[in-house]
Amino acid sequence: MKSKLRSLNSYFTGFEKTLLTSSLLILTMSYIIFPDSGTLSFIASLIGAFSLIFCAKGNPVGQLLIIIFSIIYAVVSYGMCYYGEMITYAGMTAPMAAASLYTWLRNPYGRSRSQVKIRSAGGKELAVIILLTIPVTVLFYFILKYFGTANIIPSILSVATSFLAVTFTLRRCALYALAYAMNDLILIVLWLLASVENTVYIPMLTCFAVFLVNDIYGFINWNRLMKQQSS
C-alpha cells in the first residue's frame, strides 16, 4: 500500500500536486461556506478535479472518473432544471468518455497504458468536426426548447463546446482541453446566473472556475507531452 502511494506521489510533478491540492481545498472551502449546495454536487466537484489532473497526464483513469462525474453532474443539473446540461452529460459526455476510455487504452504511448498516444488533428479533420457540431447543436436547441430549459442560450453554447471537447478527446487531440476550457467559461456564466437567484449554487460556480484552470494546464501539458512523444 505504501509503495503504491509512493508511486502515485512520484507520478505527479510538484506543480500538479500543488494544482490538485489547491483545487480540492478551494472546492472544500466553498462547500463548507455554502453547505446547502448539497453533498452530491460537492462529491461531483472533487471527482471532477481528480479526473482533470489524470486527463492532463493523458492517463485513461481520467476518462473513467469523467464517466462518474458526468452521471452525478447530470443529476445535479436536473435539480436546477438545466436540462441541457443533464442531457449533454448523461447522453453525450458520459458515453463519449466511455468510448474515449476504450480508445485511450487501445492506443497507449509505449508499453505502459498510463499515457495515451497523442496525435494532432489535420485541417480536414477539424473542418469535419466543426461541421458535425452544427447539426448537433441545432438538434439540441429544439430538444432543450421543448423541455423549457432555463437560460437556453448558454445551455446551447455548452452543448456545442461539450461536443467539440468529447470529440477531440476521442480523437486523442490536445484541443480537447481547449474546448473544455471554453465550456468551463460558458458554465461559469450559467451557474453565475443561477447563483444570482440562489447562493446555494455558488459552489458549482467555483467548481467550473477551478476546472478552467485545470483544463488550461491540460492543454499546455498535452502539447508538451506530444513534443516528448515525437522526439
Where are these regions (language model features)?
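Short, Lys/Arg-rich, polar N-terminal cytosolic tail immediately upstream
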Residues: 1-12
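Alpha-helical transmembrane segments
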Residues: 14-28, 44, 131-135
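Short, hydrophobic transmembrane alpha-helix segments
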Residues: 27-39, 56-58, 79
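Short, aromatic-rich membrane-interface segments at the entry and exit
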Residues: 36-44, 60-65, 84-89, 150-155, ...
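Hydrophobic/aromatic-rich structural module bridging two neighboring secondary-structure elements via a short loop
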Residues: 55-102
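Alpha-helical transmembrane segments of multi-pass integral membrane proteins
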Residues: 88-104, 119-144, 165
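Alpha-helical transmembrane segments in multipass membrane proteins, preferentially the mid-helix core
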Residues: 135-149, 156-175
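C-terminal transmembrane-bundle signature of multipass membrane proteins
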Residues: 167-231
